């Protein structure tokens, strides 16, 4: 099958080459690359044309990454579709091959796996993220690694586009729709994608948490007090983590992260 990989770009000249290179070196070659560019003013377009001359490229004004992704999904001709952000990259050359081989069973609706966060400034890897899909776990906190989700195009069409009224958490909303359905999946154990930590500021975290709370209440209004407990607990924990980092007590954060998830949240739900 053909696999469509959608990348939204905006002044991504510093990072897009590594993203494209990671696609070009994939062992599986039946790939459709789609770039949706928000009228970049740097060399982003030039790099895309040089490194991915056969790619589908659209450069026009949009209102954010999720509107761009929706445009890409509409254009996609592949039977399987997914995204690769402009500052992220595939971790090895067999990622797409592993994705496609997972769909050899016609009953499979989507594939997902793990990501590895990295710091662009240092190049150092930070930590893994992503676990087997679970609606219950995702209602506590985002647990499915959205960048790794590659889905049958017909399933995406059934679920509908990203709700781009959410600035940051539209992927959370879309993943909840996916998990609320009875869809069959394959979870890939080996980390698939390196994801940049850039831009994950405390301010963005707060907005993301607020949007996630609103999304949860949209689907489960009867659980309002439970979700509010989770929201305030996680927000205070994030503030404490940021303070520890500012005080250069990063080792404490690393120890806490090691034990993250050991205490069950299921009693709250």
Predicted features and spans:
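Short, structured secondary-structure boundary patches
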Residues: 187-188, 205-210, 245-250
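Nucleotide-sugar donor-binding/catalytic module of glycosyltransferases
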Residues: 1-204
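Membrane-proximal basic amphipathic "stem/tether" segments
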Residues: 220-269
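Catalytic core of nucleotide-sugar-dependent glycosyltransferases
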Residues: 191, 195, 202-227
């Amino acid at each position: 099958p053909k696999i469509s990989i959608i990348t939204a770009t905006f002044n991504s000249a510093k990072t897009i080459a590594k993203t494209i290179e990671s696609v070009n070196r994939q062992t599986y070659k039946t790939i459709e690359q789609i770039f949706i560019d928000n009228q970049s003013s740097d060399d982003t377009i030039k790099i895309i044309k040089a490194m991915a001359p056969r790619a589908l490229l659209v450069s026009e004004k949009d209102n954010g990454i999720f509107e761009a992704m929706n445009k890409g999904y509409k254009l996609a001709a592949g039977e399987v579709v997914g995204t690769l952000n402009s500052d992220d990259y595939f971790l090895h050359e067999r990622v797409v091959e592993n994705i496609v081989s997972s769909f050899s069973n016609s009953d499979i609706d989507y594939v997902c796996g793990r990501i590895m966060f990295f710091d662009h400034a240092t190049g150092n890897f930070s930590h893994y993220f992503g676990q087997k899909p679970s609606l219950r776990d995702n209602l506590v906190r985002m647990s499915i690694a959205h960048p790794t989700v590659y889905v049958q195009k017909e399933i995406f069409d059934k679920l509908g586009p990203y709700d781009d009224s959410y600035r940051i958490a539209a992927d959370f909303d879309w993943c909840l729709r996916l998990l609320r359905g009875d869809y069959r999946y394959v979870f890939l154990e080996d980390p698939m994608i390196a994801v940049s930590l850039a831009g994950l500021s405390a301010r963005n975290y707060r907005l993301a948490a607020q949007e996630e709370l609103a999304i949860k209440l949209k689907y489960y209004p009867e659980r309002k007090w439970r979700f509010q407990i989770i929201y305030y607990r996680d927000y205070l924990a994030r503030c404490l983590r940021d303070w520890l980092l500012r005080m250069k007590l990063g080792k404490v954060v690393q120890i806490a992260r090691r034990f993250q998830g050991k205490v069950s949240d299921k009693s709250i739900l």
